[in-house]
């Protein structure tokens, strides 16, 4: 059926468009010679689908305006897919043949009977020296006498003990000694001396008001109430300072004798409930005092 599509833009029918697309398709196939070869790259998982599942309906609509053409969604191909694919050339036709593999090497064959391999590395190869252990920086017990400089800044390892004689003769010990002597014997700078002098002067002299306030200042006499309050406060202080005298206990009064008499005790009786206690009281005689060096006596006059 022939009807007009897109009037005002294109006067061709769909049948004419399909016929012209088929002609251009055949012309393109004839124009492609076997000498022109191109490398075909595909993904690892979808290479077979991309080679076989081509859509031809897009070619039939290539004469439509660009506004009405369906847009193809192109997938982003990773770099690893190109590197993992292997390219093989046919000796008779020189047409590339793609085989998807998961190997990290790609083999390329040409008309020459002897194939050669091209190693393609996705990541840079690691050096072989990384697996080796780093050299020990500590000094072993066998090498203590050798002239090997030791890194004294590192932590101490009890498996490889150090020697003070080796440390004393090392450059690190000499450097520490020179730095300490320089720190002790250094001359104080002028800025430090100026700061110290300012601190001393500020501690000796108090901070007074500015001279502009002193010129307008006037001295007022204290009022009579202030003088009386000061006098009363001084008298109160004198009164509290004088403490009352402590009554002295007379030696003649025997307090223990009075307490016994109140309890019913009489002279000549024994102590206790049945009056069988001590009748004669104990007397203390002061003979002297003993020290760590000598024994002295007290002579009562």
Curated annotation (Swiss-Prot):
A Gene Ontology BP annotation from the UniProt entry: mRNA cis splicing, via spliceosome
GO MF, one example: nucleic acid binding
Alphabetized InterPro entries for the sequence: G_patch_dom (IPR000467), RBM17 (IPR040052)
Domain G-patch: 252-301
Polar residues bias spans: 29-38
Biased composition (Basic and acidic residues): 16-28
Region (Disordered): 16-38
GO-annotated cellular components: cytosol; nucleus
Name of the molecule in the record: Uncharacterized protein C2G11.04
